């Protein structure tokens, strides 16, 4: 609609560009014979058999068909009543047209006016694209006019047709607890109700067959009572000719990874996770599908009790390039995983497999954050694991990061384990002993502490093992004035170690340490 001056109004800043694109595409194909959408000559618009997009052309024709139900053109003002006809044979298509008309008229232009070609170029609106898709969905699906009684106008709802699935659909909606039937509720952290069956008229016989096959497969993989059936099923597949076997395995992999919900339902189930691990390294194509699913859902799997068991099999089943993809994800999520109860365990397991630059980067990341990770109830396990691995650079960096905190760590449950592992490491021991040596008061206090007394015992035994006689004598002498008090409470454990293991040894062996009196 033009304004009083005969000019089209300026586009509004709140335009809907996506819907505009859909409308312009419609107009583009309608103009294939140099006709404007809404012109009377447009009734023969699909007579051109060489039209570049027949489905879109059909959609436009369907618009015209319903717009003409009241002898109105798709751009006439009277068209606003089109959805008030409750007896219209196809309300969804009418709604789609009205949505198209609504956004096309956003700047008070009729859908057939030439000004519509540049309507609101700054206008994003996915709902318009949805409206356009609805046009294609309902318009003449099987060469029938929308509104005919045949139910074939609807596309087949092929829910689990494995012939049409691939790894391309991994980017599914956010994960929610599975609503698949749980054949054994106790074997999964989720439980739910079965999927409601679709209307029978929407489901073809082939879909029923595929759906039943997938349902049976999932049942075998997640049910404790049927798990042996799944193993037998794979053994039978191994007897097939190579090509047929590969085809069946690819079908299985496609079915299990086509949606995020199905894959995570299996991966987070006790038996489902075990079944997925069995599938690795049976076929290159199957390995690729499973790896892509693991890669896409990496963090969710690493933080799940059963899902974390899939990471190492996935790493071992693929080539170096794909391995590094998981290595990189591990590095990126290091600190997030380290603070999770399951994530810290999964991270430690993966560290046993990682090689190359990402291993060093993870070590560096943990070392740089060791001052707070060591006090974290879960992060401390990651720090301890790196200390056990005895990487010289990482261990030295951790010890330097913890300098000044060893007494405080020694008197906390999780921190005491970190200090003990530092004492047992050739790359961190000196830093710990230096701090203990410089504060006699705290050294004595540790002997009666609930957790610190174990650190004192460990320090004494390490110095004996490493034959550091002068230094060991120095530490014992600092405790001697307090032996009486140590006979009561937790100090008696340290006193027993000194009397039974240390005192007699001090004067027997030559000193082999670098320390001097």
From Swiss-Prot:
PROSITE patterns: PUM (PS50302), PUM_HD (PS50303). Residues 69-84, 177-190 have a biased composition (Polar residues). Residues 148-502 form the PUM-HD domain. It is found in: Cytoplasm. Keywords: Cytoplasm, Repeat, RNA-binding, Translation regulation. One of its GO terms (cellular component) is cytoplasm. GO terms for molecular function: RNA binding. Residues 42-51 have a biased composition (Low complexity). Pumilio repeats lie at residues 258-293, 294-328, 329-363, 364-400, 401-437, 438-473. It comes from the Eukaryota. InterPro entries: ARM-like, ARM-type_fold, PUM-HD, Pumilio_RNA-bd_rpt. Pfam families: PUF. SUPFAM superfamilies: ARM repeat (SSF48371). Residues 33-57, 69-94, 107-130, 175-201 are annotated as: Disordered. The pumilio repeats mediate the association with RNA by packing together to form a right-handed superhelix that approximates a half donut. The number as well as the specific sequence of the repeats determine the specificity for target mRNAs. Sequence-specific RNA-binding protein that regulates translation and mRNA stability by binding the 3'-UTR of target mRNAs. PANTHER family: PUMILIO HOMOLOG 16-RELATED (PTHR12537:SF137), RNA BINDING PROTEIN PUMILIO-RELATED (PTHR12537). This is Putative pumilio homolog 21. It comes from Arabidopsis thaliana. The gene is APUM21.
